[in-house]
Amino acid sequence: MLEIKELSFSYNKHKENIFKNLSVNFAKGFNVILGPNGAGKSTLLKAIFGLLRYQGNIYYDGVNLSKINFNKKIELISYLPQMDLNISPLTVLEMVLLGRLPELHQKISDEDIKAVTEILKALNIEDLITRTFSELSGGEKKMVFLAQTLVRNPKLILLDEPTNSLDLQKQLELCQFLQNFIKLKKVDIIVILHDINLAIRYADHIVILSNDGKLYNSGEAKKVITEKMLREVYGVSGNVILDDENKPIISVKKSIRDK
C-alpha cells in the first residue's frame, strides 16, 4: 500500500529534523497514526500529500509520489487537514461540490449533484444541503469538510484528527462510517487520532510515532498497544488486557509525567 523510505524533513535547515531517515509501511484499509503532540503526525500527512519538500521516497501502490505532478496526485489522494472552521457564504451543496470541481462556475453535471447527495446521505447530514456553511455548528462543519474530501472518490484518503469537535457518539459513528466506506469503495485511509481506544476498535493497522519523530512501533493493535508503549510514548501508567475479540482494553492509572 503506502511505503515511506528514508524520509527526512525539517521546516528550517537550521533546526533539528522532525524526521530523520524515517521508514515505515502502512497496510491496506484503515490505518491510524498515534503519538503525543509534537511527534510529527500532521507533518507526515503533509509530506505524503506533497505539501512539503523532503528527502527520501514515498510510494503508493508502487508509484513514487514525488515523481508525479500535483494534479495527478490530487486525483489519487484526498487530504483533510486540521483547519479553522471559517465563515463561508456558500451553501453546504456548494461547499461539497468544490471537492469535485476546482471552481463553481464550471458546468455542474447531474452526476456531480448525485455524488454530493449520496455522500451527504451516507454521512447522515443530507438535511444540511441547502443551509449556509457559516451557520453550522463546529461538528457539522467538520462533517461537511469530510464530505468534500470523500466526494471525489480518491484511492487514498488522509484525515488529520477528523473526530475533533465531535462528541463521543459522533466519533464512533464517524469511525464506523469510514470502516464501511473502505469496504464499499475499496479505498485506503490514514487517519490521525488522539483516542487510543478508537484506534484499537477500528484500525486494521496502527503506526505509533514517538515525540522525537521516530517510529516507535507499527502493526495490529494487540501487538503495538502495550503497557510499555503507554509509559514510553505517552508517559502514563496503565493496564492493558485483551477482550473477547483479542483486542486490547486500556485502563489508565495516572500520568508519570505529572509527578
Where are these regions (language model features)?
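A short, flexible loop at the N-terminus of ABC-type nucleotide-binding domains that lies
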Residues: M1-I4, S8-L22, A27, K67-N69, ...
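Conserved ABC transporter NBD signature motif
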Residues: Y54-L65
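ABC ATPase nucleotide-binding domains
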Residues: K223, E227, R231-K259
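Conserved ABC ATPase signature
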Residues: T132-L136, E140
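Catalytic Walker B motif of ABC-type/P-loop ATPase nucleotide-binding domains
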Residues: I157-E161
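Conserved ABC ATPase "signature" region
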Residues: D110-L128, F145, N153
